[in-house]
Regions:
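Basic, glycine/lysine-rich polyanion-binding surfaces/domains
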Residues: 1-193
Length: 193
């Protein structure tokens, strides 16, 4: 199953942003949900199935370099996708709370990302990764991620623009970046979500 936002606009140009500014952190522990609720202040009731996620922030601004997306895998396992600045602050916060909560994290230095946007982005991703379309997210703070083989594909609303972040090991991601370029997505130097 895959999702997109019902109220977000698509970029005019089909674009691919190769992105070294995102960090992926896998977060787990028997008290991972408690930490997200108590320390980060998140309401986890909307996370009803694996892949659902939400946008959060460490500084009160959902569009800053301290914002993040966190995806639910289970009560004890989550994935953060966030800018480098936010990842450093989040790692410090988790380290500070590890004595209080049964939590741990792994910075996935083996994973890289690119951002895809444009009118053809959703359909191209559904076709390329054999995803089943069907979910429409009305809340801009919700996001969704789906695993397809070695690739994790996410849907986020960034400043009222539908964007998709593709996450995989570098060699796999390079292959998919070439594929997306063959599908008409121009590589841009503009900062993405």
């Amino acid at each position: 199953m895959f999702a997109r936002h019902s109220n977000a606009n698509s970029a005019v140009i089909n674009a691919l942003q190769a992105d070294s500014s995102h960090v992926v952190i896998d977060f787990s522990g028997s008290e991972a949900s408690v930490f997200l609720s108590a320390i980060l202040g998140h309401d986890l009731t909307k996370l009803t199935a694996s892949g659902f996620g939400f946008k959060g922030t460490l500084d009160g601004d959902l569009n800053s370099d301290f914002s993040y997306a966190v995806y639910y895998f289970s009560e004890t396992a989550f994935r953060f996708v966030l800018p480098v600045n936010a990842s450093l602050q989040l790692q410090a916060l988790i380290n500070e709370q590890q004595l209080r909560y049964d939590i741990d994290f792994v910075v996935r230095t083996d994973l890289a990302t690119f951002t895809l946007k444009g009118d053809n982005a959703f359909d191209t991703l559904v076709e390329a990764f054999k995803l089943t379309p069907g979910l429409r997210l009305a809340d801009a703070q919700l996001c969704y991620g789906a695993q397809s083989g070695d690739v994790f594909v996410t849907a986020v609303d960034q400043n009222n623009e539908q964007q998709f972040i593709v996450i995989a090991k570098t060699s796999t991601l390079d292959k998919w970046q070439q594929y997306m370029q063959q599908q008409g997505f121009s590589v841009t130097n503009t900062q993405a979500a």
